[in-house]
Amino acid sequence: METLHVADEVRRAWDDAEPIRGGGVVVTGDRIGAVGTFEELRERFPGARVRTWAGVLGPARVHEGPLPEAPTPRERIHAVLKLGATAVLAEYATAPGLRDAAARVGVLVLPVAVRTEIAGVTGVTETAEVTGVTGITTVTEVTGITGTGRADLAVFDADGRCVATVCAGRLVHRRA
């Protein structure tokens, strides 16, 4: 099923000089299907479920520091998702169970920080390497998320708080 995530503003990258006002991102499964204005996407995808968010929608972030403290690895990973991140740096995911918890919900474990962005259908695709550990994907280089790239999105309100996080196409955090 397709989901059309609509926000006051869509940014392909957080430093995007030309955001799409009243824009949206279509998500099909775990992939991005299209990026554009609400009107054009609604016309192209009339059967898509629409989720409307107050704030700015853009690429999910990479959590670049120590993971928040919590009683369990699962809760530590969930705390990262609540911040709008769908990837963590490997150097901070060394505690027992953290990588398994990340893999279960689709959070990427990266060897280094990368710049994330949502590109148009003609953008550069992601390059990933699957490690020998089942279920863990280590992204060695991400130069953009294309129209067929993984759907990792975050929505932030005017105060900079994360309103929603989409990880590999799944809504994994929504602030009440």
Regions found by a protein language model. Give the residues of each.
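Active-site loop-helix segments enriched in His/Asp/Glu that coordinate
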Residues: 88-122
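Alpha-helical segments flanking ligand/cofactor-binding loops in enzyme cores
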Residues: 78-81, 100, 146
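Short, acidic/turn-prone active-site loops that include or flank metal/cofactor-
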Residues: 55, 67-70, 93, 112-116, ...
